[in-house]
Amino acid sequence: ALWRWSTTELDAFWQSIWNYFDLQSPTPHQAALVKNAMPGGQWFTGAQANYAQQVFRHADAAHAAGFPAIISENEKGLHRELSWPELKRQAASLALHLQAQGLQPGDRVAAYLPNIPEAMVAFLAVVSVGGVWSICAPDMGTNAVLDRFAQIEPKILIACDGVSYGGRDHDRLQVVADMRAALPSVQHLILLRNLDDQASLPDSTDFADTIARNDAATQSFEPMWLDFNHPLWIVYSSGTTGLPKPIVHGHGGTLIVALALKVLHNDIGCSYHPNTFGERYHWYSSTGWVMWNAQLSGLLNGTTCVIYDGNPGGSKDKPDWTTLWRFAANNGVTFFGAGAAFFANCLKANIDLSGLTGLQSVRALGTTGSPLSEDAQRWGTQQFERLGTPNIWWCNISGGTDFAGAFIGGNRELPLVPGEMQCRLLGCAVEAWNEQGQPVLGDVGELVCAQPLPSMPLYFWGDKDNARYLSSYFDMYPAGHGRQPGGGDGPAS
């Protein structure tokens, strides 16, 4: 009944989510859903938002409770913790630097960074002053990155000199130099020395210098209020059918959907709230996967984000699928997420977690990216039973880059069936449709969302008249319904 209400009374449901999370805006909004249309739904007209503002409103309370904002490690064993005040100060310092370089609201900032705290700092700095964020992982080569960044014409490029992965260092200075040469829109390059303290490129600024400021301006800095639908970030489709689609999501829609998913369905509370055990959220991802964006959402309500940069399976010479588990055990992770393939590899390697007593902090396991097999789920459940955690909860989700969220996910109140997902998410009118556009149960169909969501793409960057957007999502069926491309065919139940 609750799900049906949430998908038939969209205005009332999303207003209740706004109220539940006490979302802030200096200006009032007309209604949650002003125009119910697909495409073209209009949400919270009149409201203002800023993703970074929602993050930092929890900084003081989380810090006072003694919890860090970010805990990170890499495969070389470098352990770092970033406090909430330091996260805010560094983001403010970089934001002021970006403004001094001429960054205006709506300008794009491209990042070529690994999954380290500096990437989160850079994101918060960019969006706090209205810049539009876009990131590619450093495991991508020049051509793949340019296929994405050339479409959005970034004004500023933030890039690293290289990364460590699989037991080896991978220099990326030449890739960065080639990118800058091929992107005439770039007016300023910020170089993060991730491998070599002496790395440099001509006419670049050291990232460390941009986050070093600590004065009255950084102390008083606050993210600017933006229109609810101001562009937040640009993410990309896989590019298997042409150039990757540059998908634009807005501040307000992204943060409200992320909060509903993370708190109501993933059951991830805030670090400083009573009875949430000092919540520590980890979802293994590179910065090139939308799950990095999902990991970021932990900051939206004061959760500690616990991130790992490196190969989860060790190296080619020394494979070790206990790497991430040891990382989680050593850092008190409470929610441990990864792609379903990770759990399949752990099963295949026949690893034993019984000696990692620190894993008793974990109270939930999350999976996505591909179907999780029954055998892999049973393996994980048995491992945690041996650790003294019977019936560990699995939060298996199906989502998409396209709408920065999930359609199907977890519910602690429902039974677990190995290899299956528990429920359709609140607010997501998800069905399986046959070729005639009719809903089907127990049969193969296309995964369809038949009602609008606040986090639907605003548009594709540079897509004149929304032609590419419409053909991607709204050509298959009549009556203006959209489907998640790449959602896969599967039996509906």
Labelled PLM ranges:
Residues 31-32, 55-83, 193-199:
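AMP-dependent adenylate-forming
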Residues 76, 159-228, 349-351:
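ANL superfamily adenylate-forming
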Residues 253-280, 288-334, 349-350:
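Conserved AMP-binding/adenylation subdomain of ANL enzymes
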Residues 114, 156-175, 308-312, 331-379, ...:
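Adenylate-forming
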Residues 4, 52, 66, 70-124, ...:
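Conserved AMP-binding/adenylate-forming core of the ANL superfamily
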Residues 363-365, 372-493:
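Conserved AMP-binding/adenylate-forming
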Residues 80-85, 223-226, 232-256:
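Conserved AMP-binding A3 loop
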Residues 110-113, 119, 123, 127-179, ...:
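Short beta-strand->loop structural element characteristic of the AMP-binding/adenylate-forming
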